């Protein structure tokens, strides 16, 4: 069946990962957006007026970019192995904010506030790799890795080694799932539940 309507964030991002049937209507949502927001909020990471480098141009990076734009990011570095292959819709998504499209080698030249890994590089079982080198991590204040297994990727280990703030993606995983439950149940779920579940899941890794 075709979707009847889209939530504002799903429409802006151009991707749906949750649907809700209500009174004959089918509404589409993107809960990665809310999940990423909860991840930042619970870790005290500010977006307003900050510059952010987003590694990767896949589906989750679209939600991350939209959240950053909606919450006042001042500049974006969208990082891809081949900047020529960045899809037009990604460029359109970033059009309201000063954006530079850079490859991984050239990213070493820039400095910024947030460095966000939206790629699977470093995920279990291939945990001995990082999407970027120490030279790049050194130029940013906070490293966010949306990977949650392992809890501390090589990328985050690099950040900690350099004295940077390092945050993994477990809380986002839980928060986006809870956001879907909130849509289906039509009620809010306490943030404490998200924190508790994320902590329990991290212990299992």
Model-derived segments and their meaning:
Residues 70-75, 161-165:
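Conserved S-adenosyl-L-methionine
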Residues 1-43, 152:
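Phosphate/diphosphate ligand-binding glycine-rich loop within oxidoreductases
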Residues 28-30, 49-69, 80:
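Glycine-rich adenosine-cofactor-binding loop
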Residues 142, 146-205:
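Adenosine-phosphate binding glycine-rich loop
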Residues 71-93:
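NAD(P)-binding Rossmann-fold cofactor-contacting core
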Residues 97-166:
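Rossmann-like adenosine-cofactor binding region
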């Amino acid at each position: 069946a075709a979707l009847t309507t889209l939530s504002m964030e799903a429409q802006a991002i151009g991707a749906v990962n949750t649907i809700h049937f209500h009174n004959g209507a089918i509404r589409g949502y993107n809960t990665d957006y809310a999940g990423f927001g909860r991840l930042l909020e619970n870790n005290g990471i500010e977006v307003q007026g900050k510059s952010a480098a987003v590694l990767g141009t896949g589906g989750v990076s679209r939600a991350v970019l939209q959240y950053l734009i909606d919450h006042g990011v001042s500049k974006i570095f969208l990082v891809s192995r081949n900047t020529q292959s960045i899809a037009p819709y990604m460029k359109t998504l970033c059009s309201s904010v000063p954006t530079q499209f850079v490859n991984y080698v050239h990213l070493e030249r820039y400095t910024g506030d947030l460095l966000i890994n939206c790629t699977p590089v470093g995920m279990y079982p291939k945990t001995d790799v990082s999407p970027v080198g120490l030279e790049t991590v050194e130029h940013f204040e906070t490293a966010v890795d949306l990977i949650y297994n392992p809890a501390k990727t090589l990328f985050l280990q690099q950040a900690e080694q350099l004295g940077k703030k390092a945050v993994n993606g477990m809380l986002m995983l839980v928060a986006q799932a809870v956001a879907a439950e909130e849509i289906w149940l039509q009620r809010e779920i306490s943030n404490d539940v998200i924190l508790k579940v994320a902590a329990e899941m991290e212990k299992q890794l």
